[in-house]
Regions:
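C-terminal motif of bacterial Sec signal peptides marking the signal peptidase cleavage site
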Residues: 17-21
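Short, well-ordered beta-strand elements
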Residues: 67-101, 117-121, 144, 264
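Extracytoplasmic/periplasmic solute-binding protein
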Residues: 74, 139-145, 149, 187-209, ...
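Extracytoplasmic "Venus flytrap"/periplasmic binding protein-like
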Residues: 114-186, 219, 338, 359
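Short, solvent-exposed loop/beta-turn-alpha elements that line the ligand-binding surface or hinge
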Residues: 169-177, 281-302, 375-382
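Glycine-centered hinge/linker elements that transmit conformational signals in sensory
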Residues: 239-242, 282-327
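Extracytoplasmic/periplasmic substrate-recognition and gating elements
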Residues: 358-428
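Conserved C-terminal helix/tail region of periplasmic/extracytoplasmic solute-binding proteins
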Residues: 393-405, 415-505
Length: 505
C-alpha cells in the first residue's frame, strides 16, 4: 500500500505542477529548496513505479498498427442534471485546459500513435439495451461496453458478453485493474466484466465518509487521519464522535432538519458500506464457481446488530437519515446543503458527491474510509454503489479478440498515469487546497474495495433491500428474518451461478 501511494503521489504531482508551482514557491522562505525536495521525491517515486511489475508496460511495441481503426465504446448518456455521473472519460474532441478532458485527449493520442487506433464514443440513454440488440443481430458496431455493474451482471447472466479471461493482453494483475474486486466478479473461470482505471464512474461510485472540520474541531475530536492510520477508526468511535457533535440548537427537545446540528448523515443504503466495511462476506465465491452462503454467519449477524444499533430510526437524536424525508422536493440536494451549512458532522456518501459539495462549501472537510467494526479487524474495507459504478465488458459479437484485448488493456494502462491522476487532482484541488491526507485516504479506499456478487445481482437476490429493512428497524430480529429469506436468496444464487458458468456464453 505504501509503495502504491508513493507512486500515486508522483503521478499526482506530475499532473498538477503547472497548476501549483507558484503556490509551492511561497510556502517557505526558500522556494527553491521546496521545489527541489518535491522534484527529488517525485523522481524517487517514479523510479519505484518503473520497477513495479504491476505498472510495467508489457504491451507490444512493433507490428501492431491497426491503420486508423475506430474502436467504439458504448456508454451512458446521462441527463443534463446528472452532473456527478456525466461520462467524460471516453473521447474528447480537443484540448480545453480542463484537467480530465486534456488527460483523456492525451491518453487517446498515445493509443493512436502506438497502435493506429482512434477511440470513439457512442453514448445512449440505455446502453445495455442498445448493446443487446446489436449483439443479437451479430452487429459489431461497438468494441467495448461501459455501463453499470448492475447492468453488466444482468447481461452476463443472459449470455451477451465474452469471457474476458480469453482476451489476449488483458492482465487483471496490473495496477490499472481493480484487483480487489476480482475475487467477487470472477465465477469459476469466467470474468464477464471488470472495473478499470479508464471508467471514472467506477471510482466515483465508491462509498466513503466526509467529516466537517469545523464541527470536529469544535467538538475536540483528534486528527481523524491519524486515527485511521492507527487502525482505531471504528463504528463505536464514529457513534461517540457523532453524538458529541449533535446539538439541539433551539433547545426544543426535538432534532429538526435545517435547524439543529446532527452528528452523522446517511441513507438506508448506507448499510451496504457499513456492513462490507466490517469485512463481512454475504455470498463467498469459491475458485470452482460454487458459493458459500454467509448471510447467517456469526460475523454478519453480529455486524448487523451493531449497525442496527447505529442506524435504527429511533436514533434521530444524532442521525439524520435522508430516506425519512422522501416527500421533500430535491431532498438529496438539500441533504448536501445540511453538511455544507455546518449542520452535519459526518456524511456517508459516494465519491461522486464530493465535487458537488466542494465548490460552495465554506468550511473545510476531509475524506476518510467507512469505519471498521472494531480495532481487532485486520484492515479497512470499502465498496461502491453497484447501480452507479461503471465497469467494462466485451460483447460476444466481437470479431477480433486480439485487437479488443490489446486496446482494452492499453486504455487502462494509459489511463493509470493520465486520467486517474487528473481525476484525483480535480477532486482534491476543488477543495481549494492540496490535501495529501485525503489523497492517501482515497488510495486506501480504492485499494480495499470489496465486491459481493449478491449485491451485483440485487435485482434477483433482493439482498440489499433485505439488509436495509433490518438496518433501520427499531425492533431487531435479524436471525428469524434471515431464516425466512434464505431460500429466496439461495434459489436466485443457484440460477445465477448456473447461467454464468454453463449458459450461452
Amino acid at each position: 500500500m505504501k509503495k502504491r501511494f508513493a507512486i500515486f503521489v508522483a503521478l499526482l504531482l506530475a499532473a498538477s505542477l503547472p497548476l501549483s508551482s507558484c503556490g509551492n514557491q511561497t510556502q517557505t522562505e526558500s522556494g527553491t529548496d521546496t521545489e527541489t525536495t518535491e522534484t527529488t521525491g517525485t523522481a524517487e517515486a517514479e523510479q519505484t513505479a518503473e520497477n513495479d511489475p504491476a505498472t510495467l508496460d508489457e504491451l507490444p511495441t512493433d507490428n501492431m498498427d491497426y491503420q486508423d481503426y475506430t474502436f467504439t465504446i458504448l456508454g451512458h448518456l446521462y441527463e443534463a442534471g446528472s452532473v456527478a455521473w456525466g461520462v467524460q472519460d471516453i473521447a474528447v474532441d480537443e484540448l480545453t485546459g480542463e484537467r480530465i478532458n486534456d488527460a483523456v485527449f492525451e491518453r487517446n493520442n498515445r493509443i493512436a500513435d502506438r497502435f493506429g487506433v482512434t477511440i470513439a464514443k457512442n453514448l445512449e440513454t440505455y446502453p445495455s439495451d442498445v448493446g443487446k440488440k446489436l449483439i443479437q443481430s451479430g452487429d459489431d458496431a461497438f468494441d467495448l461496453l461501459q455501463t453499470t455493474v448492475e447492468k453488466q451482471a444482468s447481461m452476463a447472466v443472459d449470455g451477451y458478453l465474452a469471457n474476458m479471461n480469453d482476451l489476449p493482453y488483458v492482465n487483471f494483475e496490473k495496477a490499472w485493474w481493480d484487483s480487489s474486486t476480482m475475487e467477487g466478479i470472477r465465477v469459476g473461470d469466467k470474468t464477464f466484466y471488470a472495473l478499470g482505471d479508464s471508467a471514472l464512474n467506477g471510482k466515483k461510485a465508491s462509498w466513503l465518509m466526509l467529516f466537517n472540520k469545523t464541527l470536529t474541531d469544535k467538538a475536540g475530536i483528534p486528527n481523524l487521519y491519524d486515527t485511521v492510520r492507527e487502525g482505531k477508526w471504528t463504528l463505536d468511535l464514529l457513534q461517540t464522535y457523532a453524538e458529541s457533535i449533535a446539538v439541539d440548537v433551539n433547545g426544543d427537545g426535538e432534532m429538526k432538519w435545517g435547524e439543529d446540528v446532527f452528528g452523522v448523515g446517511l441513507q438506508d443504503e448506507s448499510v451496504s458500506p457499513l456492513l462490507i466495511g466490517t469485512g463481512a462476506k454475504l455470498i463467498e465465491l469459491n475458485p470452482d464457481g460454487t458459493y458459500n452462503y454467509r448471510l447467517n454467519s456469526e460475523q454478519v449477524v453480529n455486524a448487523m446488530e451493531r449497525i442496527n444499533g447505529f442506524m435504527k430510526k429511533s436514533n434521530s437524536n444524532f442521525v439524520l437519515n435522508c430516506n425519512r424525508y422522501d416527500g421533500m422536493s430535491n431532498q438529496w440536494i438539500e441533504f448536501r446543503k445540511i453538511f455544507m451549512a455546518d449542520q452535519m458532522g459526518f456524511y456517508i456518501l459516494a465519491l461522486s458527491g464530493v465535487n458537488l459539495i466542494a465548490g460552495d462549501m465554506q468550511s473545510d472537510f476531509g475524506i476518510i474510509p467507512v469505519p471498521k467494526l472494531n480495532e481487532a479487524q485486520d484492515q479497512y474495507y470499502s465498496t461502491f454503489q453497484y447501480n452507479n459504478a461503471h465497469s467494462l465488458s466485451v460483447p460476444k459479437s466481437a470479431r477480433d479478440l486480439t485487437r479488443t484485448g490489446l486496446i482494452t488493456e492499453a486504455l487502462q494502462m494509459f489511463s493509470h498515469d493520465t486520467v486517474l491522476p487528473a481525476y484525483y487532482d480535480y477532486t482534491l484541488t476543488n477543495r481549494n487546497a492540496r490535501d495529501t491526507d485525503s489523497a492517501e485516504m482515497l488510495d486506501l479506499i480504492f485499494a480495499s474495495r470489496n465486491f459481493d456478487i449478491s449485491l451485483a445481482y440485487n435485482n434477483k437476490t433482493g439482498v440489499l433491500s433485505f439488509l436495509q429493512t433490518n438496518a433501520v428497524a427499531d425492533s431487531f430480529d435479524y436471525a428469524s428474518k434471515e431464516t425466512a429469506n434464505r431460500q429466496k436468496v439461495e434459489k436466485a444464487m443457484d440460477e445465477i451461478i448456473e447461467k454464468v458458468l454453463h449458459g450461452d456464453n
